[in-house]
Amino acid sequence: LHTVKENYIFEHDELNKIDYKNKKVIMITAHRRENWGEGIENICTALNKIVEENEDVELVYLVHLNPIVKDVVFEKLGGNPRIHLLPPQDTQETHNLMNKSFMVMTDSGGLQEEAPHLGKPVLVLRDVTERPEAVEYGTVKLVGTDVEKIVCEANNLINNEEAYEAMSKAVNPYGDGKASERIADAILRYFDLSDKEVDEFDR
């Protein structure tokens, strides 16, 4: 991702104060209509448990502005110094936060594609996904909104290095970021302007 920078300084200063090197920071987004009500409540309950059970974990929840989501999240998670509740961030802030994070928990479709590019395991807070290839290749895992399942899968990634490595180093089904180079090579070869073989993406 071209938006990611190694020494990125966030515009939102609270993000600059987080100890990414010594803490396992989990980035969270959850706002889909299907999760309104009991789903969001369960997610929040699970997040509280994850923080309680893991002293080296901090959460950054980018909270949707819809009161149906925001009110529940702030009521259940507000006031915990290791849970940072922030408004949605722009693309560059979000990508760099994701890059500095340990893992991602989300019900967003886009993040299921973006996080694997950065080697970040994704727990999907839904029972189904439009990205079944990500599940197949092991870059994401469906956990739904069941409290115990969310906590169990999160704790496994937090405390089991082998499980974390398996997801973070899984083959990314969405490519390697070199599609435009391959297209250019293919066009040049088609018009006999180059004899370079096109490097195909191999999953």
What are these regions (language model features)?
Residues 1-61, 66-203:
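Nucleotide-activated sugar donor-binding and catalytic core shared by glycosyltransferases
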